[in-house]
């Protein structure tokens, strides 16, 4: 499902209620169907794929921004570090769910216009298929969710920059960028991998929560959050 396998016997949005009412035999619905006759198992597969795409993309965004920001802050120290960490403190104080709601609401019309004006462009086709609200989510992740990664990388850089091999690299005339790229970040790989992996379920939960509220992935596409919302409606009905 996460890789977009398309071996299912029918589409995720095909309505089959009329065929069932006419007595036609259809492929067995293992999880049953929703009120529109759409197969729940297939929609669950697509929902998992959408959630995994969002989780992995958010983790990559957090990885790039957090590692870059944290390494610069930790390496240069002094006033640079103080200013950059106060920015992190401000971002930490922001209510992330509210910011995501505002960004998703504000970006929706602009993304729709972008899709209309750039037909055929791969990003336009992606957001046309996956829904315009995803752009707002990705922007929110880029603005808010990298701060934890940056703090972890900064702390590791503060320790590593005192090592002898960093002093030797400076003595040989290596630039700050080269020292960070070739000597410091590779030695933070353990922390980077662990933090990135922890970011994936956090992003999936955030997307599911937003879709549950109705401001995430839009119909006819589905996600785990929107499916939970539909299921809650069914539980309340019956």
Where are the model-predicted features located?
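Gly/Trp-centered helix-boundary motif
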Residues: 1-63, 67, 203, 216, ...
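Alpha-helical membrane-interface segments at transmembrane helix boundaries
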Residues: 38-53, 81-92, 185, 189, ...
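Transmembrane helix boundary and interhelical loop/hinge segments in multi-pass membrane proteins
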Residues: 156-165
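Transmembrane alpha-helices
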Residues: 49-65, 158, 177-209
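Generic hydrophobic transmembrane alpha-helix motif, especially the helices
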Residues: 30, 34, 51, 57, ...
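Non-cytoplasmic
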Residues: 97-102, 106, 110, 138, ...
């Amino acid at each position: 499902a996460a890789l977009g396998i398309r071996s299912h016997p029918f589409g995720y949005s095909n309505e089959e209620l009329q065929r069932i009412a006419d007595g036609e035999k259809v492929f067995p619905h293992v999880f049953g169907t929703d009120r529109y006759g759409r197969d729940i198992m297939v929609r669950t597969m697509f929902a998992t794929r959408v959630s995994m795409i969002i989780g992995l993309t958010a983790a990559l965004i957090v990885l790039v921004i957090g590692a870059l920001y944290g390494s610069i802050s930790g390496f240069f120290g002094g006033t640079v570090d103080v200013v950059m960490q106060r920015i992190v403190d401000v971002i930490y104080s922001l209510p992330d769910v509210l910011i995501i709601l505002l960004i998703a609401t504000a970006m929706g019309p602009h993304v729709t216009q972008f899709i209309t004006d750039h037909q055929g462009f791969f990003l336009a086709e992606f957001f046309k298929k996956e829904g315009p609200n995803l752009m707002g989510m990705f922007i929110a992740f880029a603005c808010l969710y990298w701060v934890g990664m940056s703090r972890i990388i900064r702390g590791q850089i503060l320790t590593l920059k005192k090592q002898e091999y960093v002093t030797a690299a400076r003595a040989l005339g290596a630039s700050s960028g080269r020292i960070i790229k070739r000597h410091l970040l590779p030695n933070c790989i353990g922390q980077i991998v662990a933090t990135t992996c922890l970011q994936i379920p956090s992003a999936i939960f955030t997307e599911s929560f937003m879709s549950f509220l109705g401001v995430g992935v839009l119909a006819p596409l589905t996600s785990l959050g929107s499916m939970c919302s539909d299921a809650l409606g069914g539980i309340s009905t019956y």
